[in-house]
Amino acid sequence: MNLEQQLLAYTPYNEQEARDRELILRCLKDEPDVFTRRNELVHMTASAWIVNADRTKVLMAYHNLYQSWAWLGGHADGETDLLVVALKEAREESGLAHVRPVMEEIYSVEALHVCGHVKRGQYVSSHIHLNVTYLLEADENDPLFIKADENSGVAWFAPKEAEDVCTEPWMRDHIYRKLNEKLRTL
């Protein structure tokens, strides 16, 4: 299935997901180059909510740009299979050798505002990440490493603690809390 088909098959968890899914579907139809950063207004990203085998821990990275503990993930950069993106980013940003999808279906959807910032010496205007999240599982005993150009820490947290260490109120209260609520229903 392509992304549009996956999104149409996905049952939104709440109103935020329902509205964001509709926005993403509209942008897939109406916006050019949403799978690349050439579209400076909106573009696709994939995130990974990474849990250990018994679902008692969540992996977070201390994100240099946001100065907060956050999920792992990144830009599609031309890749239309966002599960591939989520897995690649999980490995690159954490050093995990053993990471796999808990399920191949979409776990969550979000349209996320990104404030203007400087990246690699260039100003990047405020824009929206059209984000698809996948639930991944990793071996908590795998060695972890920092990807210095993106993060300055990688660590496992209890799910509630993963919410608490995030200093971004919207992400903590509306995204990470939702992901953990969904985790409890599996």
Residue ranges and their predicted role:
Residues 36-71:
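N-terminal strand-loop-strand
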Residues 62-86:
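Charged low-complexity stretches with an acidic bias
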Residues 166-186:
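Charged phosphate-binding loop/patch that engages nucleotide di/tri-phosphates or the phosphate backbone
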Residues 32, 41, 66, 141-143, ...:
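Generic secondary-structure boundary/loop-capping signal
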Residues 11-47:
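Acidic, metal-coordinating catalytic segment for phosphate/diphosphate chemistry
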Residues 77-170:
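Unchanged
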Residues 1-11:
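Generic N-terminal amphipathic, Lys/Arg-enriched alpha-helix
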